[in-house]
Amino acid sequence: MRYSSFILLFLSAALCTTRLTAQNNAAATAAQNTAGAPDAVGSTLTLPQAVTIAIKNNLIVNQSDLSSQSYKISFDQSWEYMLPTLNASGGQSLNFGRTLVTTNNSYATSETNSGSASISAGLTLFHGLVYQNNIRMQRYAWDASKMDLQAQKDNITLTVLLDYLAILSNRDQLNLAYEQSRVDSVSLDRVTKQADAGALNPVSNLTDLQGQYASDQINIANAINTLEQSKVTLFSILNVSYKADVEYQNTITATDISQYPATSDTIFQHAMQIIPTIKSAQLKVYAYEKNLAVQRGYYYPTISLGGSVATNWTNIPSPTSSVVTSTQIVKSGNYFTDANGNNPVYTITQNGYNIYPKFSDQFKNDRGESFGLNVSIPILNGLQTRNSVRQAKLTLKNYEYQNTTARHTLQQTVESDFQNMMAAYKTYKFYVQAAAAYKESFRVTNIRFTQGVIASDAYILAKGNSDRAEVNLAAAKYIYLFRTKVLDYYQGKLTIE
């Protein structure tokens, strides 16, 4: 096809300029279970619908969203580190042999059953501002992850925009191929009738036009294949099953083509304020500045409050009292002698039982409380804090370099895309003039050919020039449009309609 190489060049240049990672995203998305992906494509697919579906189904975007949610959890946890601690514990044990009974501090040789319970609480009063700086660090990290997520969405948006415009461009190319074939068909019919009527020297004109018409059919077949391939590419980004009978809306008219109203410097200044990758790089610098402050905080003492309540119980506690149920006085069988002679010795025997404390009484009576102020001063811990601080400094410096690199890259990219836009606009304007000139030239040539003034070779040459100019003009329109959309993105003005 005579214009297929030009279209391929257009797509390649546009992809390289915007530095999109469409192929990586498509490869990662293909790893998903496409059978379970939502198929939201109906009979008509608009550009906003395509962007929405692609963002929803893209694996890279979903992974970035999960990462952002993880950073949100870390941020929540950083606040919760400042809350008091409150813990409860309890246990029950069965002991055999010689066992210390903690309730009465005595030993028992029988089987014992004992238990304990405690509640403890603590509150950190000062920790070198570690918690406060960690909160700020996690907040910056969370914000950076949201910018990374938005960058992925923007990447998908631009990729879908490019693929959608490629479909519109290829559809226009197909329509042009049909129109070119129609014009040649009219001329071929006329010359065929002349040949059938025995007109003078129509044979060479007829064979030339037959060859031209056959070339038109080849161009149509190639245009159809190119259009279908561009549709397949779009559906691979959408991660849905391919549907051939989908209508694509074209909201682009000739009135959309005008000189872009901005300078490269203005675009760059806007981009510095809104591009997610730039924001993410700066936020990561802020985050690791706070990470350095966190690591330095471990040099300082930790002051905390602590308290606890504990109790225990056993199945063989010490008796609290005893109850006498009867008293007996009996002779012991022994005697003592005094002036009156031998006298019997009596013994007093009391019968009764011991009263042991109930479980609830043990739980209450054996309870103990404690409260204290604790100070922990780091003196020497394998130089862990020192090395952590050194590592934090290196990490911070690395992210500062990344931030600087991101800014320089953005400036170069904006300038390059701006120059490409200017070139695309000039090219479009030249093709407007060329198409108009070649169209008029073909009109005159067609009249002269119809009148038999010129031969078919002049007709075919003029028509070929006109056809190429129309094809190039259609492609140039979409090239310029995409260039302007990229610059709109840099300024936060990109609209998907």
Regions inferred by a protein language model and the residue ranges of each:
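Acidic, low-complexity, intrinsically disordered peripheral segments
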Residues: 7, 22-40, 320-325, 472-497
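Bacterial N-terminal signal peptides
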Residues: 7-14
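Bacterial Sec-pathway N-terminal export signals of envelope proteins
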Residues: 22-91, 97, 171, 200-203, ...
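Small/polar, glycine/serine/threonine/aspartate-rich low-complexity segments that form flexible
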Residues: 31-43, 89-123, 251-259, 306-377
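Amphipathic alpha-helical coiled-coil scaffold segments and their short linker/junction regions
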Residues: 51-55, 206, 210, 240-355, ...
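Sec/SRP-type N-terminal targeting helices
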Residues: 62-66, 79, 125-153, 204, ...
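Periplasmic alpha-helical coiled-coil/stalk elements that build and connect Gram-negative outer-membrane
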Residues: 155-273, 420, 424, 444, ...
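Short segments within alpha-helical structural elements
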Residues: 189, 215-240, 432-493
